Amino acid sequence: MSRYLIVGAGRSGINAAQLLIKVGEDFIIYDGNENFDTAAACEKIGRDNIEFILGDFSGFDFSRVDICVVSPGVSLEMPIMKAVKEHNIPIWGEVELAYRHDKGTVIGITGTNGKTTTTSLTYDIMKRHAKKALLVGNIEIPYTGYALESDKDSVAVAEISSFQLETMVTFKPHVTAILNITPDHLDRHKTLENYIAIKESITKNQDENDFCVLNYNDPVLREFGKTPRCKVIFFSSSEELESGVFLRGDTMIIKENGVETPVCTTKDTSLVGMHNYENIMAAIAMTHAMGVPLDTIRQGIKEFTAVEHRIEFVAEKNGVKYYNDSKGTNPDAAIKAVCAMPSPTILIGGGYDKKSSYDEWVATFEGRVKELLLIGKTKYDIAAACDRAGFKAYKFVDTLEEAVSIAAADAESGDCVLLSPACASWDMFKCYQQRGEIFKDCVRAL
C-alpha cells in the first residue's frame, strides 16, 4: 500500500480522496488555506479521521509520502510542489490517478478552444455506440469520480487541460485530439513554446495502434503531425485533404484510401460558426477512428445542442439578441464569438489577467462591434489595445450587472449583445459558469 499526499482540497482533491478510499489506499491532504473547513471536506469525502496539513508545511516529514496527487488548479511552482520535487516524490495529476484505475478505452481531447463542445459531441456520439460511455475530465466531472465505474467495454471521453497534461505520466488514450493552439495561460506556462509542448504531450505515450486527430489549418499542429508514433488524422475547414476530414462547401467529408464519403452538412447541426464546424469534424474523425458507424455519427451530430456558456443564445428583448459566451476566456475564443454574431454587436469584455495580448481580438471589431463595455482587472489593458487600433467606442464599467443595463439602453433593434470576456473570471467571480449565470439572470430581468 502507498501513502499519498493530495495537494489541493477542492473538487478534484475530494474526488481523488474518495477514489483512494475505495481502493484501500492511505492519504494526507494539504491545502494552502489555513482556515480551510476540514469538517466539511471530511463529510464530502465520507471519512472522519483524515489528516490535514493547512498553510505552513515546514514541519512535515515528506518521507511519509510515496506519491503526490495534485489538483489541476495548483501550480507546480508553488512552494509545496517545489518541496515535493526536492524530495523526489512522483507527481500525478487527477487524470493520471484516474487513468491507472480505468479498465476501458480513453479518448483524450485538448486544445486552446473548442474542447468542451468537441468533448460533449464526441461523448454524445459514443454513448450511442459503446456499451458504456463516460464524460469526464475538465468538463465539470472529475475523472476520478468515474474511473472505478469503468470496465473493459467502457469508453471515457475526457476533456484534458494543459494544467492536467503537466502531470501526465502513463496516461495513454487510444484516440487523442489537439483542436488548435493559440496563446493562453501564459501566466502559468510562461512561454508559448512551453504551452505548445504541454499540449502536444498528450500523444507522448501513444503507439502505432493509436490515433491522433489534428487541425490541419493550424501551422503548429500541421508540423507536429509529422512526429507522433501513432496514426495521424487531419481535419480542415479550408483545405481538401488527401486523407482526413474536410469541408467542401457546406458538406463535411471523410476521405480515406482515395474514397470520399459525405457525412453531413452544416445545415444538419444547430451549431453555428466555422470554429464549430471544425469541432464537428474533429468529433467525426475521432469517432470514425473508434469504429462508430457513419449513421450513428450523423444522428449524434443532428441531435446535439450547443454547450452552455459557449455562444449560448439567451433571449431576444426589444428586438435585441443576447448571447452568453462566458466560456470565451481567451482572445482566440472571443474572436470566434465576435465573428459568429449575425449583426452589429455591443460587446462585454474583460476579467482576470492571464497575460494575453488583446490586439488580434480588437482587430476584429471593425464593422462588427459598435460598442465595448469593459469590466475586470484587464479593462485598462484592453482599452490600450483599442487605442492602438483606433477603436474609441469603449466604456469602463464597474460590474457585469451595470454592463448589461448599459448594453440594453444603448442597443437598437436588430443588434446583438454579447458577453465574451476574452479573459478568465477569477477576479470577480468563482468561475466562468457563475459569470455566465449572472449575465443570463440580468438579461432575463430586463
Question: Could you describe each region identified by the protein language model?
Answer:
Residues 3, 19-22, 43, 59-63, ...:
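Phosphate-binding loop of NTP-binding sites
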Residues 43, 359-414:
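C-terminal helical cap/extension that packs against the catalytic core
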Residues 48-60:
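Glycine-rich, highly charged phosphate/nucleotide-binding loops
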Residues 9-10:
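Glycine-rich Rossmann-fold phosphate-binding loop(s) that bind the pyrophosphate
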Residues 55-56, 92-96, 229-247, 298-302, ...:
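Beta-strand->loop->alpha-helix junctions that form or flank phosphate-binding loops
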Residues 20, 68, 109, 138, ...:
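Residue-level signal for inorganic ion chemistry
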Residues 2-3, 15-23, 132, 266-368:
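Nucleotide phosphate-binding/pyrophosphate-handling subdomain across enzymes
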Residues 25-42:
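NAD(P)-binding Rossmann-fold cofactor-contacting core
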